[in-house]
């Protein structure tokens, strides 16, 4: 029953025309094993990157059955630096050249191709023109660091190299799982299918809400901005959205219309002429010329306009509408900018107008969320 429910959840992605396969982000080996049980099918052709020929590889091979195929890939390394036990049992996966009686232990030689690569980049040669149904990726094992940008880059390249789109990608990565738990598709927020907690703390791991189009971008304001908040719009252009943010923060929370709160709002953009126009049209709002990537300057905007101590720096909510990042391309650049803003400004939430980020919010799934949903049924 659980398998039927979760496979239906994943198949909803593939039912959408031209929709990319879901990326299932797992934070632990236990979650990976559960995801394999629920998303991988008998007879599947699966690539495992970062195969350690241990429990995960065993579970994968059992799941695909004798009619399935698995390409298990790892990079060559010394036992002393790999974190592995030197006496790990590879017999079920690698044929022995030693003569003697056959072993009675379980063997997967009928379905496994094991590749130990001299260089990490060689993994691409195993994917081009192939038609894998799935990939299981252990980011930390494969590249040595658990970085979600690397995980998404590898997943994207794997998809692009396939002759036919894979059905699912399962990734073991705590950082990617963390991102998946924080990213909220704008439509789910606006239609009420995702309800945020009443109280969100400011943090370097804020909620991220990607939007498509300026109307959707502005419609999120009542859901995320409170009276008395400190808010900045990065990429304010001529300042129209900034004025809406300004109106939202100056209203006293719980007060009557027109009652003034103590919030702060500013808009920044890299274009001096744009900012000059915004200042002329909306003189009551703080506008400054600032590059979005200069996060220290974003902090200085508030410091220069408010008599606050260092502990009060940063913002409750950040809105971002950056030229070059709002379209279908620039995903890794968008994530890098969001990461820089989050670490420097520590907001509760970041709203970004970006089609590529919105698509990621549709594709990236925190396995913990899916499992919790199934557990409660």
Task: Label every PLM stretch briefly.
Residues 52-53, 237:
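Conserved glycine-rich SAM-binding loop
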Residues 116-123, 290-296:
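Conserved SAM/SAH-binding loop
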Residues 76, 271:
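Conserved SAM/SAH-binding beta-strand->alpha-helix loop
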Residues 83-86, 278-279:
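Conserved SAM-binding loop
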Residues 48, 233:
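Class I SAM-dependent methyltransferase core
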Residues 2-40, 179-226:
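S-adenosyl-L-methionine
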Residues 141-202, 324-377:
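C-terminal substrate-binding/active-site "lid" region of AdoMet-derived donor-dependent transferases
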């Amino acid at each position: 029953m659980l398998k039927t429910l979760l496979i239906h959840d994943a198949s909803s992605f593939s039912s959408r025309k031209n929709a990319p396969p879901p990326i299932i982000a797992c934070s632990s080996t236990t979650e990976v094993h559960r995801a394999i049980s629920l998303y991988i099918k008998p007879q599947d052709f699966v690539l495992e990157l970062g195969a350690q020929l241990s429990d995960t590889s065993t579970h994968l091979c059992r799941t695909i059955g004798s009619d399935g195929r698995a390409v298990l890939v790892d990079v060559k390394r010394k036992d002393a630096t790999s974190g592995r036990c030197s006496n790990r049992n590879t017999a079920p996966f690698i044929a022995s050249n030693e003569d003697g009686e056959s072993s009675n232990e379980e063997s997967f030689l009928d379905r496994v191709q094991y590749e130990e690569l001299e260089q990490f980049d060689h993994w691409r040669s195993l994917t081009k023109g192939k038609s894998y149904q799935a990939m299981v990726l252990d980011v930390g094992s494969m590249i040595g660091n658990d970085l979600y940008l690397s995980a998404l880059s590898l997943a994207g390249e794997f998809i692009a190299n396939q002759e036919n789109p894979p059905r699912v990608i399962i990734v073991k990565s705590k950082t990617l799982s963390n991102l998946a738990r924080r990213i909220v598709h704008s439509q789910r927020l606006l239609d009420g299918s995702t309800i945020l907690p009443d109280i969100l703390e400011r943090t370097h791991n804020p909620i991220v809400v990607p939007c498509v189009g300026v109307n959707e971008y502005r419609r999120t304001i009542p859901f995320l901005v409170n009276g008395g908040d400190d808010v900045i719009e990065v990429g304010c252009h001529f300042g129209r959205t900034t004025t809406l943010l300004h109106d939202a923060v100056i209203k006293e929370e719980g007060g009557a219309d027109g009652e003034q709160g103590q919030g702060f709002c500013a808009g920044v953009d890299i274009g001096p002429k744009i900012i000059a126009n915004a200042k002329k049209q909306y003189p009551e709002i703080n506008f400054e010329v600032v590059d979005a990537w200069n996060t220290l300057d974003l902090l200085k905007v508030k410091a220069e306009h408010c008599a606050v101590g260092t502990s009060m720096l940063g913002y409750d909510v950040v809105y971002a509408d950056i030229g070059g990042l709002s379209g279908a391309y620039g995903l890794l650049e968008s994530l890098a900018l969001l990461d820089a803003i989050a670490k420097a400004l520590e907001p509760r939430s970041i709203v970004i107008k970006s089609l590529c980020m919105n698509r990621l919010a549709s594709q990236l799934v925190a396995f913990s969320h899916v499992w919790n949903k199934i557990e409660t049924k």
